[in-house]
Amino acid sequence: MSNLKEIKRKIKSVHNTQKTTNAMKLVSTAKLKKAEEAAKRSKIYAQKIDEILSEISFQINKIVHNEDDVRLSLFHKKEQIKTVDLIFITADKGLCGGFNIKTLKTVSEMLKEYEAKNINIRLRAIGKTGIEYFNFQKIELLEKYFHLSSSPDYEKACEVIHAAVDDFLNGNTDEVILVHNGYKNMITQELKINHLIPVEPKSIEQTHNSLLELEPEGTELLEDLMKTYFEYNMYYALIDSLAAEHSARMQAMDNATNNAKARVKQLNLAYNKARQESITTELIEIISGVESMK
């Protein structure tokens, strides 16, 4: 009888877990739809800015005639890289499968790679998971940002990227790289590594088939465009990461719900078998008692 009570207790416990994971799956699905729409809208805008600034990087000398202009450094890779700033995004919350693992593994590998080349790498961490991971590894973080990956904010994104750009312009770092696990589709996330600064041309073909004409008076436009480019790339990465996080959590909770269903089914079979054995044992005892009284 005690065995039956224990199995029944387990069934109730797993069933409650199933309800919780299913509810979390539904919440993640609803949030994913909103995040997916926001990511798609932002991607179109970010890509267009990226295309324009990439084209400008081919024709930068037409705009900026002073070789000492600090803006030129944003378009030219330094011959010797001594310091690299790495901005990476992880989730603030758990229960999202292997979503954070890809990013943390990549950042760890990049750390080893740059250290092997005697290049100093400085980490700017966005998201509680990544911050706690590297704190546990006793690896110093230059900047820590909580609650930004779960609630993307444009002004906060600007604060993050402005600090990195200022460090680059002041000579404190030679390159800025942005790493995050992005949204590909409902069931797939895609690790993205964006070499943000210096700005590099994405396609040489653009120099041959350019429809963009630039004038010397375009220096003000260039400055505004660069500012928007850096800010929006940072903001888009946050939105893209959040959509991927909801996608990963939806999958993780769906798997957990299915596993709970399978476990309940197994426990029900075990309960019925144990109950049948208990009834059989009782019948045998009754029959034996009757026989002994004859």
UniProtKB/Swiss-Prot annotation:
InterPro entries reported for this sequence: ATP_synth_F1_ATPase_gsu, ATP_synth_F1_gsu
Assembly and oligomerization: F-type ATPases have 2 components, CF(1) - the catalytic core - and CF(0) - the membrane proton channel. CF(1) has five subunits: alpha(3), beta(3), gamma(1), delta(1), epsilon(1). CF(0) has three main subunits: a, b and c.
Species in which this protein is naturally found: Campylobacter jejuni (strain RM1221)
Keyword field contains Cell inner membrane: yes
Cysteines joined through disulfide linkages: none
Keywords: ATP synthesis, Cell inner membrane, Cell membrane, CF(1), Hydrogen ion transport, Ion transport, Membrane, Transport
Function, in words: Produces ATP from ADP in the presence of a proton gradient across the membrane. The gamma chain is believed to be important in regulating ATPase activity and the flow of protons through the CF(0) complex.
Cell compartments where the protein resides: Cell inner membrane
Gene that specifies this protein: atpG
One Gene Ontology CC term in the entry: plasma membrane
Gene3D superfamilies assigned: 3.40.1380.10, ATP synthase, gamma subunit, helix hairpin domain
GO biological process: proton motive force-driven plasma membrane ATP synthesis
Family in the record: Belongs to the ATPase gamma chain family.
Membrane topology: Peripheral membrane protein
HAMAP family attached to this UniProt entry: ATP_synth_gamma_bact (MF_00815)
Protein name, UniProt field: ATP synthase gamma chain
GO molecular function, a single term: proton-transporting ATP synthase activity, rotational mechanism
UniProt xrefs under CDD domains: F1-ATPase_gamma
